[in-house]
């Protein structure tokens, strides 16, 4: 990407109406959600793209730094930091990462150029507890929509470890 694309802050996301944003970010790389002629990005996507130097985010006429976008995200979601680490790790590995809110998970993950996602990702801190009932419910939903359930565990050193959890029938 050569020229930085301008996005504008709007609540808990950012948007651009520039055709370049739609072509380069949405069509070619799977970022955001297209509504009419606007490309909307989540704060996690925006933070990632600002950190990479691909976009800049304006609030009124003032450009927001990566740290300011991160703080906005953290105010809206106390787990923004660990979700960002997982998002960044998956994107850096070449996967397309989208919200999985409607599936009761944090992210759905696609292989590049795939039409359907393979995985649902639930992000947890290593110190968090997850009840067997919660885990079972998440695996059932994933199985019901033909996806693999993956727990992304972030440790105290901010390293991410992925655990695939499967439904087994005997």
Curated annotation (Swiss-Prot):
One of its GO terms (biological process) is tRNA splicing, via endonucleolytic cleavage and ligation. Transmembrane segments: none annotated. Pfam families: tRNA_int_endo (PF01974), tRNA_int_endo_N (PF02778). The lineage of its organism: Archaea, Methanobacteriati, Methanobacteriota, Thermococci, Thermococcales. Belongs to the tRNA-intron endonuclease family. Archaeal short subfamily. Keywords: Lyase, tRNA processing. One of its GO terms (molecular function) is lyase activity. GO terms for cellular component: cytoplasm. Endonuclease that removes tRNA introns. Cleaves pre-tRNA at the 5'- and 3'-splice sites to release the intron. The products are an intron and two tRNA half-molecules bearing 2',3' cyclic phosphate and 5'-OH termini. Recognizes a pseudosymmetric substrate in which 2 bulged loops of 3 bases are separated by a stem of 4 bp. It comes from the Archaea. CDD domains: tRNA-intron_lyase_C. It catalyses: pretRNA = a 3'-half-tRNA molecule with a 5'-OH end + a 5'-half-tRNA molecule with a 2',3'-cyclic phosphate end + an intron with a 2',3'-cyclic phosphate and a 5'-hydroxyl terminus. The active site is at 110, 116, 147. This is tRNA-splicing endonuclease. Its EC number is 4.6.1.16. PANTHER family: TRNA-SPLICING ENDONUCLEASE SUBUNIT SEN2. Homotetramer; although the tetramer contains four active sites, only two participate in the cleavage. Therefore, it should be considered as a dimer of dimers. It is an enzyme of class 4 (lyase). Gene3D superfamilies: 3.40.1350.10, tRNA intron endonuclease, N-terminal domain.
């Amino acid at each position: 990407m050569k020229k930085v694309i301008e996005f504008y802050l709007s609540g808990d996301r950012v948007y651009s109406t520039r055709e370049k944003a739609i072509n380069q970010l949405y069509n070619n790389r799977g970022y955001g959600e297209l509504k009419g002629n606007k490309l909307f990005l989540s704060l996690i996507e925006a933070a990632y793209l600002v950190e990479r130097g691909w976009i800049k985010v304006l609030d009124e006429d003032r450009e927001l730094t990566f740290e300011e976008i991160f703080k906005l995200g953290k105010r809206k979601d106390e787990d923004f930091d660990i979700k960002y680490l997982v998002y960044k790790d998956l994107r850096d590995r070449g996967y397309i990462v989208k919200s999985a809110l409607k599936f009761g998970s944090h992210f759905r993950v696609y292989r590049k150029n795939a039409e359907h996602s393979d995985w649902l990702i639930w992000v947890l801190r290593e110190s968090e507890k997850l009840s067997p009932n919660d885990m079972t419910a998440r695996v059932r939903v994933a199985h019901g929509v033909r996806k693999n359930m993956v727990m992304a565990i972030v440790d105290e050193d901010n390293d991410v470890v992925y655990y695939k959890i499967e439904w087994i029938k005997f």
